[in-house]
Amino acid sequence: MKIAKNVVVSIAYQVRTEDGVLVDEAPVNQPLEYLQGHNNLVIGLENALEGKAVGDKFEVRVKPEEAYGEYNENMVQRVPKDVFQGVDELVVGMRFIADTDIGPLPVVITEVAENDVVVDGNHMLAGQELLFSVEVVATREATLEEIAHGHIHQEGGCCGGHHHDSDEEGHGCGCGSHHHHEHEHHAHDGCCGNGGCKH
């Protein structure tokens, strides 16, 4: 079976940054399973998989615009500390989910000053070209329910135990996808800008 829209695909992969740093992988014995054609992977990888079959191995370089986008300076904001309600200590690297006009947005603290902090809403891989090494492990026809929902169904939830909540970008899992699993804190009203952040 060739990979095409509405085919469920299992892939083993490694993904590295331009400087060779391994940022994610799924081995053959624990492959990533997804539904093709529903934006469950970064678009550059999904396009490269189109027409492939079980046993195919390949490498593909994915430009930022077909991965996690270019780095956007407008996604970096300085906000007052007092909007982070219920957080005892703010430190660089803390992650929050900000409720914005465009929906939930993951942000990370990149600087902490006396009265304010800098938060960055860019994806950690924004602006980077990614190298994927991929092997197609299995394919099957999707169920009507999977097609209707736009993602696979399996015991334990999406991708082996994760729930169906997702960020604004998609429903997949793993670095090759857009799924977001950081739920430590929640920010409200525009990237922690107006209302506040809380657990």
Curated annotation (Swiss-Prot):
It comes from the Bacteria. InterPro entries: PPIase_dom_sf (IPR046357), PPIase_FKBP_dom (IPR001179), SlpA/SlyD-like_ins_sf (IPR048261). One of its GO terms (biological process) is protein refolding. The keyword Transferase does not apply. It is an enzyme of class 5 (isomerase). Ni(2+) binds at C173, C191, C192, C197. GO terms for cellular component: cytoplasm. This is FKBP-type peptidyl-prolyl cis-trans isomerase SlyD. It comes from Pasteurella multocida (strain Pm70). The gene is slyD.
